[in-house]
């Protein structure tokens, strides 16, 4: 039975990763904002409680 997938040799560094890089950059930006907001809320709560 014939295979429907062509088997090729892997060549390191030839894959287009622009979408993965953009997704990772967005994730890092979002994680940074969530961290900053969380710290700001904690500081506000600490100051409001004192």
Swiss-Prot record:
This is Cytochrome c oxidase subunit 4. Not required for enzymatic activity or proton pumping of the cytochrome c oxidase complex. GO terms for cellular component: plasma membrane. It is an enzyme of class 7 (translocase). InterPro entries: Cyt-C_aa3_sf, Cyt_c_oxidase_su4_bac-aa3. The keyword Nuclease does not apply. Pfam families: COX4_pro_2. It catalyses: 4 Fe(II)-[cytochrome c] + O2 + 8 H(+)(in) = 4 Fe(III)-[cytochrome c] + 2 H2O + 4 H(+)(out). Its EC number is 7.1.1.9. Keywords: Cell inner membrane, Cell membrane, Membrane, Translocase, Transmembrane, Transmembrane helix. The lineage of its organism: Bacteria, Pseudomonadati, Pseudomonadota, Alphaproteobacteria, Rhodobacterales. GO terms for molecular function: cytochrome-c oxidase activity. The chain crosses the membrane at residues 18-49. The gene is ctaH. Residues 2-17 are cytoplasmic. Residues 50 are periplasmic. The keyword DNA-binding does not apply. It is found in: Cell inner membrane. It is a single-pass membrane protein. Coiled coil: none annotated. It comes from the Bacteria.
